[in-house]
A protein has these predicted regions:
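Non-catalytic, mobile gating and regulatory segments of ester bond hydrolases
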Residues: 1-164
Length: 165
């Protein structure tokens, strides 16, 4: 069965003017937010391109290999390598990266904003990673009304709406 890697091979040479943003593109936008781009994607509202961010990520993390932890899809890093070079995705702007881990509060949160060529801004939340903090936070979702990362997500959306309006 075809997957997002196949899609990038198939449509990676086509601009968004030729083929508008679709559900698979939106899925790829979410995958862009999986790695830790600390020091690569600005947190202050300035932007970098997908090509710049992914290139810097692999250049500064030589030991990353082809897999992004135990629970992330094995296709995430190979897909990022492909989109960084593709005509379709390489010039998309990224901004507002945050990666927050507070062990004492059982808090794990990460997000960035993707500036889609159709003018829509997408927020990519990483979700649970393979740290103990992330898994403990997941368990707390079952017994708490609100966990710290949910408050972080709300604050991030408010910040992004104000910053990128």
């Amino acid at each position: 069965m075809a997957n997002a890697l196949d899609y990038v091979d198939w449509r990676g040479d086509l601009s968004f003017d030729t083929v508008p943003v679709n559900e698979i593109d939106k899925y790829i936008f979410t995958c862009i937010g999986k790695p830790d781009y600390t020091g690569i994607i600005p947190a202050d509202g300035k932007t970098v391109t997908v090509n710049e961010a992914v290139g810097s990520y692999f250049a500064t993390r030589e030991d990353v290999g082809d897999k992004l932890g135990l629970i992330s899809s094995a296709s995430t890093l190979p897909m990022l390598r492909k989109i960084a070079l593709s005509d379709r995705f390489r010039d998309i702007k990224l901004s507002g990266f945050i990666n927050k881990v507070v062990v004492e509060k059982t808090e794990q949160f990460s997000a960035l904003t993707v500036f889609s060529p159709d003018g829509v801004k997408y927020v990519s939340f990483r979700g649970t990673d393979d740290t103990i903090v992330g898994w403990k936070e997941n368990c707390e979702l079952a017994v708490k009304e609100v966990v710290p990362a949910q408050l972080d997500a709300k604050a991030y959306l408010e910040w992004a709406a104000e910053t990128y309006d």
